[in-house]
């Protein structure tokens, strides 16, 4: 049904970021040896990804409120794709760290915007049901990605992990084009602003609870 298709597409989009983390973990020792980097520098490639995927979600929410859901989703996936290709071609650890930060910013679109789409489409029990289906698809990534990563590394080396992740980004772009409808109306967009979002964030930060 259309309902299940939407849950599958949104779940896969949400899983792209975690997929890029979990599939990458088995590659850390090989990356250190290949690029002549110490353990701390290699672990930094993971830290900056977590940092940027968190920061990015704060940005994509209000931006998608103002311009619609699909444009920032396309932009984020395209950024993720380009950064993944850059990671696959990186020749030193500093470049890889920088590109992992950019990759996380792109992946944040897949984490934040599908949840906003669910809220646009449904409320109450229907929203909870769609979100639970989305999370079910999302939860498969931490189980399968490390196994897939280990297999890819054994066959083709650590750089191949990023090529596989880049292919996932292409599939995400295609799924967005074919399977995701714009759910934010022009009238709703007019009611949104970055200033309003910033004010809401400040209110949350001031809340002692």
Region spans (language model):
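Small-residue-rich transmembrane alpha-helices and their cytosolic helix-loop interfaces
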Residues: 14, 46, 50, 131-139
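Residue-level signature of mid-helix packing/kink "hotspots" within the transmembrane helices
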Residues: 22, 50-58, 142-143
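Extracellular/periplasmic helix-loop-helix junction of adjacent transmembrane segments
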Residues: 27-55
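Conserved MFS/SLC helix-loop-helix module at the cytosolic interface between two early adjacent transmembrane helices
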Residues: 55-94
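A generic transmembrane-helix signature of 12-TM secondary carrier transporters
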Residues: 77, 81-84, 99-100, 166-173
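Helix-loop-helix hairpin linking two adjacent transmembrane segments in secondary transporters
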Residues: 91, 95, 133-178
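Cytoplasmic helix-loop-helix junction between adjacent transmembrane helices
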Residues: 99-138
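Juxtamembrane intracellular "pre-TM" segments in multi-pass secondary transporters
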Residues: 185-209
């Amino acid at each position: 049904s259309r309902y299940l298709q939407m849950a599958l597409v949104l779940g896969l989009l949400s899983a792209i970021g975690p997929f890029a983390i979990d599939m990458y973990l088995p590659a850390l020792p090989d990356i250190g040896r290949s690029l002549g980097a110490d353990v701390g520098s290699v672990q930094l490639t993971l830290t900056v990804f977590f940092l940027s995927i968190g920061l990015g979600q704060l940005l994509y929410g209000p931006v998608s409120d103002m311009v619609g859901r699909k444009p920032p989703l396309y932009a984020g996936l395209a950024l993720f794709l380009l950064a993944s290709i850059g990671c696959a071609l990186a020749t030193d650890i500093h470049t890889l760290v920088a590109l992992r930060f950019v990759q996380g910013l792109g992946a944040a679109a897949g984490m934040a915007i599908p949840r906003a789409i669910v809220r646009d489409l449904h409320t109450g029990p229907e929203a909870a049901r769609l979100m639970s289906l989305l999370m079910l698809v999302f939860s498969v990534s931490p189980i399968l990605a490390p196994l897939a990563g280990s297999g890819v590394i054994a066959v083709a080396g650590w750089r191949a992990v990023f090529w596989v992740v880049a292919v996932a980004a292409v599939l995400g772009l295609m799924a967005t084009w074919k399977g995701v409808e714009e759910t934010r109306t022009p009238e709703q967009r007019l009611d949104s602003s970055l200033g309003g979002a910033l004010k809401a964030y400040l209110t949350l930060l001031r809340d002692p609870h």
